């Protein structure tokens, strides 16, 4: 998370790759620059923004050490997700940029609950249009997170999907998806990718998705034809 930079003699924070330093959203000058860049793209005619890990732009200002889980690494998520000023920053973004253009906005929000989602994607339009949440994707998580061959228990998946449908009803908007570039293929994970059942599994998964309330997302992941990734 913390990387030493020899040129400046200082450490910088990166929640992901060391080539991706986290921006300091506490700094109003940084926010100004971000909003200026967004405005530039809006004036070029973009249709919207998919905001990567937007729930992580506000950190616990004390920067406490994360709990060591399974002797592997510190868990930063309680201190970087849904931080104390995240909604304040998004409302500022909305007022200064998003509300001035005809856009669609979706925020990738790791660690989000339905209660938090009601703020991010509230129907009064003060922040974003919708969120990408991960609770249904985490029903098989184990010691190594999503890196497992464990098949999901559909009872758990159904319970999570029902919760998001019911809790957001009339209060916020959700996105609908089964996989993406960070997740295993849906047919391999939630269905059966054998030659006999691959097609019917895909139809079953698609039917389930499109009968729910929300905006469906269908991604075409660049993988060699005929290669089915089980993880």
Descriptions of predicted regions:
Residues 1-231:
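Active-site and adjacent substrate-binding regions of carbohydrate-active enzymes
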């Amino acid at each position: 998370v913390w990387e030493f930079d020899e040129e400046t003699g200082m450490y910088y924070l990166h929640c992901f790759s060391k080539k991706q330093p986290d921006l300091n959203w506490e700094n109003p000058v940084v926010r100004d620059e971000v909003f200026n860049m967004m405005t530039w793209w809006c004036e070029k005619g973009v249709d919207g923004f998919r905001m990567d890990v937007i729930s992580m732009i506000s950190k616990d200002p004390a920067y406490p050490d994360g709990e060591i889980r399974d002797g592997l690494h510190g868990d930063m998520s309680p201190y970087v997700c849904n931080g104390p000023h995240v909604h304040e920053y998004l409302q500022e973004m909305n007022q200064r940029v998003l509300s001035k253009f005809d856009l669609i906005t979706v925020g990738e929000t790791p660690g989000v609950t339905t209660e938090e989602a009601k703020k991010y994607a509230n129907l009064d339009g003060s922040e974003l249009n919708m969120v990408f949440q991960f609770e249904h994707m985490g029903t098989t998580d184990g010691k190594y997170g999503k890196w497992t061959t464990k098949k999901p228990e559909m009872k758990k998946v159904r319970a999570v999907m029902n919760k998001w449908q019911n809790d957001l009803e009339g209060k916020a908007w959700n996105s609908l998806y089964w996989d993406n570039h960070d997740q295993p293929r849906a047919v391999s994970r939630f269905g059966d990718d054998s030659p006999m059942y691959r097609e019917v599994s895909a139809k079953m998964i698609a039917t389930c998705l499109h009968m729910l309330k929300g905006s469906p997302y269908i991604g075409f992941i660049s993988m060699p034809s005929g290669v089915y990734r089980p993880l």
